[in-house]
Design a protein with these regions (language model features):
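Divalent metal-binding segments
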Residues: 1-101, 120, 125-177, 197-198, ...
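His/Asp/Glu-enriched, well-ordered alpha-helical/loop segment
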Residues: 158-169, 176-199, 204, 209-220, ...
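Non-cysteine beta-strand/loop elements that form the S-adenosyl-L-methionine
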Residues: 110-130, 218-230
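Acidic (Asp/Glu)-rich catalytic clusters
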Residues: 74-79, 103-113, 190-194, 215-219
Length: 317
């Protein structure tokens, strides 16, 4: 990051953090298992018994096979108290091709540890103004944020996974990033048509009406995080402007048009507290100072909020 004088200020954003992560000493398998058990314990404390997680990107120096084996050993030892659907995070097509060549595929595994989708992180976040927007930030017009992939690399990853029969889940917070993801999905499905692909958009926050229609048309899954309204109620119009904000976080519209919309907490960004997320889904306000409601017509009923954490999450996994 840069300060107001254009000097480096010591902040690292998104991919720029990779060298720092790579310098962290890699844990051995027993240490990995201890971390997993601590995570299970914390999730159980909130009543959570199943999760979707992208562990491969935590320690870049550890091969994915070590993560998988650690989970399998915990399951064999009877210690895995959370069902894990592994979202497989890769950044290079060759990594994914090798993963598939090694015999991995969405659905492979057991009820306690199962390979899930290819996971891609398409852009950053609204808070730090790193989500990729088409028209720039309303409070910083020259800043559009940025994508974390070139269009070519994202397309190569999406096409490879789709052709192999793998599910895909892509983080997209800004509308320009969402354009990229929808284009890549559309191209891949034209090349290799599939019916029950369950490809999805993770977060799906800043969006335009035309994009909501494309999501419905492609029968995509949306992995929403209603808990984000707790913070974003304070900044959404400031960041996006009134026009884009009016069609963003439109999860009720998507649901009413037949799109499967699940809910999660994005832990560790937020606490794994499903009840807090349900509260935000129903009230569309922040939790404690009750800012909002933001687009109250997008509120879920209590049953819809509960379903989003249970039935709809099962559809996404």
């Amino acid at each position: 990051g840069l300060d107001e004088n254009g000097e480096l200020d010591g902040r690292f954003y998104d991919n720029a953090m990779d060298p720092l992560y790579e310098s962290i000493k890699a844990p051995d398998r027993e240490e990995l298992k201890e971390m997993m058990l601590e995570a299970c314990k914390e999730l159980n404390r909130y009543g959570v018994t199943s999760s979707q997680t992208d562990d491969y990107c935590v320690y870049r120096s550890i091969p994915y096979s070590e993560v998988n084996e650690a989970y399998k050993e915990l399951e064999a030892e009877g210690k895995l108290t959370v069902r894990v659907y592994e979202q497989c995070n890769f950044t290079e097509p060759e990594q994914l091709r090798q993963f598939l060549a090694d015999g991995n595929m969405t659905g492979k595994g057991t009820d306690h540890f199962k390979i899930g989708p290819l996971k891609l992180l398409g852009d950053g976040a609204l808070g730090g103004r790193t989500a990729y927007l088409s028209k720039g930030y309303a409070d910083d017009p020259d800043n559009h944020g940025f994508p974390l992939f070139s269009k070519e690399t994202m397309q190569a990853l999406v096409s490879c996974a789709n052709a192999a029969g793998m599910q895909i889940a892509t983080h997209a917070i800004g509308d320009a990033c969402l354009d990229m993801v929808l284009d890549c999905y559309e191209n891949a499905l034209k090349e290799h048509p599939r019916t029950d692909h369950r490809h999805g958009i993770v977060h799906c926050q800043a969006s335009r009406a035309d994009q909501l229609e494309r999501i419905e048309k492609m029968n995509l899954h949306v992995y929403a995080q209603s808990i984000f309204l707790d913070y974003d109620n304070h900044i959404v119009e400031q960041r996006l402007g009134k026009e884009l904000a009016s069609t963003s976080y439109n999860w009720k519209t998507l649901k009413d048009h037949g799109v499967s919309v699940s809910n999660g907490t994005d832990c560790p960004v937020e606490l794994p507290d499903a009840l807090a997320g349900m509260q935000c889904a129903v009230t569309r306000t922040s939790l404690h100072d009750h800012v909002g409601p933001y687009l109250p017509e997008q509120a879920f009923s209590v049953k819809e909020a509960l379903d989003s954490y249970t039935i709809e999450s099962a559809k996404g996994s």
